[in-house]
Amino acid sequence: MDAMEFFRNSSGNWRSQRTTHHLAFRRAETGTSEIFVEALGADDQKIVEICEMHDCDPAKAVGGAFVRWESAMAWDKEDENHEGTTVFALIPDEDNPQQGLLLRERGYAEIVPIAGRYHIDEEEALVLVTEYETMTTIERFWFANPDMRLRTSTVQRFGGFNTATYCTEMRVKEENTVSASPAPAYEQFCGW
């Protein structure tokens, strides 16, 4: 599997349940997300624009993905908003197409255009490593089956890990899509 095949397999609507461990506080927080993924071809205007934004030759891109999400976390305050969109563009290394440059118009940890690295590991998981000005994020996505995707991520700030997250993402049919709602703290023990 290559990264574009991973994005094509990820296309559609997903419902995510996650637990984020705030390591410095020794506390865990649960949350839910509604996620939409659309694989984009190399000639898609969004891919061309992201490449140009990062001063990269669009002809080197193999495609990418558009992602939209709406999320809620158990500790959210009333005015907190966890929703947005981003576009990923993939530019594989010339000597190894299983890894390369990942361009984003918007990062997750910091809302700025960002370039990171991606690779497909030996278990066909997509691994994204993004270095921000004040932190590093490492995300790993893999499929348990075609309708169940798993994700882990860590955020390291100033030399120490401060969050670790585990997500279970289930594919949903269009008619079953609902908005994310705050997850009670006990939900992690209740299943779906």
UniProtKB/Swiss-Prot annotation:
| Pfam family of the protein (one) | CpeS
Give the gene that encodes this protein: cpcS2
CDD domains xref list: lipocalin_CpcS-CpeS (cd19433)
**Name of this protein:** Chromophore lyase CpcS/CpeS 2
GO MF entry, a single one: lyase activity
Described function:
Covalently attaches a chromophore to Cys residue(s) of phycobiliproteins.
Q: Does the record's keyword annotation contain Lyase?
A: yes
Please tell me the species this chain comes from.
Answer: Synechocystis sp. (strain ATCC 27184 / PCC 6803 / Kazusa)
> What Enzyme Commission number(s) apply to this enzyme?
4.-.-.-
Which keywords does UniProt give here?
Lyase
Say which family it is in: Belongs to the CpcS/CpeS biliprotein lyase family.
